[in-house]
């Protein structure tokens, strides 16, 4: 019978980050079990992988900072001489529209936390990002009809933000894990969890094979609730698989100049480039677009809805006036595991000895993943190393009270 010191269930960005952070600081025998045929085929593969610092809670700002630091030094962090992924330092532009005090307030707060930020006015936007319209009014969502814009904007810019390819990143982590002796097993589904005597003893796979372990980490994303049930763990948090829509289109030649990762709070969209700037990826920042619960994460509509596409295109046409309505627009859908209680993840040990969790990331998981991995690995091993975060795991403990927030959206 195969034995491991730790089993991580789920080979997305969270599971592999935990496994890698364990492997790089210990000699533990580690296995990652993934039911899909490739790593990152769940929430991670559909992620826009935007790496931004600004959050309303300071501890999450620090987690984002520490996660992004790993992405910005990816070869050093993974130990790979030629990693597939590399960080795109496009910066992150926040456009709050008519709330003219917001940018200065957030700039002061981020500066106090050690994050490099700037406040940009209309002239700055036009000079640095000529394709972007700094209008402070909301677009016409119904028809997309142009209006007479009002200017005088105050915008907030994260100098060191950007994005990284989510699939390449996950493949790199899997390679780093294997190089360190981690057994990354694909097409391997956990059928049941042995918790005799109130402690994890091992797991049984779909093919009937039994694996012994005293410690199992549930990093199964939208499939996490089934493992709670298998382990007999009562979950007080409302973790809901939620359909999230994204659209993309080719970038036309009319859009000149640099386009940063952008958060248009009036328009309810975020956007960034991809494929060396040749495409635009567009998603929602609205809480109302994070409400579609999915009963079965293996069965949900994976194409974006027509009305969603049109609403977001109206917003994009307003923010990027040179963007024509012509051209093919494509869409896809992925899943967040939304923690409806406070849109923050829950981590750590449960009432069943040896059953640990890392679930409910609510769309924040990618940028936080290296830091989350370090939190969990340090809590298990007691050892610290480079690229660790100083934020204690207790901040996101499964036993904590919900974090109080003004808005339960992906912006948090």
At which residue positions do the language-model features occur?
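Flavin (FAD/FMN) cofactor-binding and adjacent substrate-gating region
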Residues: 99-180, 185-186, 192-199
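Glycine-rich FAD pyrophosphate-binding loop
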Residues: 23-44
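Flavin (FAD/FMN) cofactor-binding core of flavoprotein oxidoreductases
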Residues: 123-133, 241, 303-381, 385-405
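Dinucleotide-binding Rossmann-like beta1-alpha1 core, especially the glycine-rich loop
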Residues: 48-141, 268-270
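Active-site lid/adjacent beta-loop-alpha segment flanking the redox-cofactor pocket in flavoenzymes
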Residues: 236, 252-353
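Central helical "cap/lid" subdomain
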Residues: 40, 209-258
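Beta1/beta-strand and adjacent pyrophosphate-binding region of the FAD-binding site
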Residues: 1-14, 31
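Conserved beta-strand-loop-beta-strand element in the redox core of flavoprotein oxidoreductases
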Residues: 191-211, 216
């Amino acid at each position: 019978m195969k034995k491991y010191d730790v089993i991580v269930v789920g080979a997305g960005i969270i599971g592999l980050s935990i496994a890698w952070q364990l492997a790089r600081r210990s000699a533990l025998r580690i296995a990652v079990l993934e039911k899909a045929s490739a790593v990152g085929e769940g929430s991670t593969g559909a992620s826009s992988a935007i790496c931004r610092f600004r959050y309303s809670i300071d501890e999450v700002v620090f987690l984002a900072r520490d996660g992004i630091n790993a992405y910005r030094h990816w070869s050093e962090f993974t130990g790979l001489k030629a990693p597939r992924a590399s960080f795109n330092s496009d910066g992150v532009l926040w456009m709050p529209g008519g709330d003219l005090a917001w940018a200065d307030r957030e700039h002061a707060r981020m500066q106090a936390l050690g994050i490099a930020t700037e406040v940009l006015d209309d002239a700055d936007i036009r000079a640095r990002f000529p394709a972007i319209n700094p209008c402070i009014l909301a677009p016409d969502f119904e028809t997309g009809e142009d209006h007479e814009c009002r200017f005088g904007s105050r915008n907030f810019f994260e100098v060191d933000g950007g994005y990284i390819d989510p699939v390449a990143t996950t493949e790199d982590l899997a390679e780093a894990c294997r190089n360190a002796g981690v057994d990354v097993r694909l097409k391997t589904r956990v059928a049941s969890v042995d918790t005799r005597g109130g402690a994890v003893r091992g797991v049984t796979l779909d093919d009937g094979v039994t694996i012994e372990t005293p410690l199992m980490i549930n990093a199964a994303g939208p499939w996490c609730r089934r493992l709670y049930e298998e382990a007999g763990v009562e979950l007080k948090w409302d973790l809901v698989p939620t359909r999230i829509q994204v659209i993309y289109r080719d970038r036309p030649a009319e859009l000149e100049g640099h386009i940063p990762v952008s958060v248009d709070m009036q328009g309810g969209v975020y956007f960034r480039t991809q494929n060396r700037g040749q495409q635009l990826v567009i998603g929602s920042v609205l809480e109302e677009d994070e409400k579609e619960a999915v009963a079965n994460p293996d069965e949900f509509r994976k194409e974006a809805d027509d009305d969603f596409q049109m609403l977001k295109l109206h917003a994009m046409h307003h923010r990027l006036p040179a963007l024509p309505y012509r051209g093919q627009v494509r869409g896809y859908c992925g899943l967040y595991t939304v923690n409806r209680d406070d849109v923050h993840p829950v981590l750590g040990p449960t009432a069943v000895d040896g059953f640990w969790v890392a679930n409910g990331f609510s769309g924040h998981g990618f940028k936080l993943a290296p830091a989350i991995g370090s939190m969990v690995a340090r809590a298990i091993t007691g050892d610290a190393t480079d690229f660790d975060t100083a934020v204690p795991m207790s901040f996101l403990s499964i036993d904590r009270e919900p974090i109080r927030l003004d808005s339960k959206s992906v912006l948090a």
